[in-house]
Amino acid sequence: MIDRAQFELIKMKYGHYASWAIWADEGEKPKDNVGDLSVFNIESNVGLLHQLNPGIILVGLNISRRIKFPLANFHDARSQAMDYKIRYALKESPFWGAYMTDIIKDFEQKVSGKMMSYLRTDKLFEDKNVEIFCEEMKDLRIDNPTIVAFGRDAYAILNRNFKNKFKIFKIPHYSNYTGKEKYREEVKSILCFT
């Protein structure tokens, strides 16, 4: 568990590309309430800090657009967004409450191939972002996290930088063209939860 000061520090330093794997319950439609950030209000959600699990880190590649509000990454309410599938896949699992971030910070790009192409031309940029990721883990006060990568590109970066240091799992990216039920089954199978 993290304390309030640590939560606020994480929110202040990393809130525009990080979040936590906690969402409001869905409503009548699967995407309902996925963008409801009131779940991160410590005053109204008094059990929030007990739900957070910084020992598990879910890692995407990079933001696809600017994040306007702290902790809004992975909580996109737009109709075309697929973040709701993460909520469905992790609900009532040991991965609910995990820390969520991107390995590449502040690089807005929707096409992962363009991101990976850029990294091939600028290794120092990747190194800088890996340093920031290490700083995030330090601020989370976690020495040996379980790391879960969303998709092959995030996994490739994590694997080449941390393969001898941490256990890294690769799950399909949530934007893949698959239904939420199938996505949950794939994630459950890889992460071995019921």
Model features per residue range: what roles?
Residues I2-T146, A156, F169:
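A polyanion-binding, active-site-adjacent surface
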Residues K91, N159, N176:
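Hydrophobic/aromatic-lined pockets within catalytic cores
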Residues K105-D106, R152-A156, Y174-Y177:
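Short Gly/Pro-enriched loop/turn and capping motifs at secondary-structure junctions
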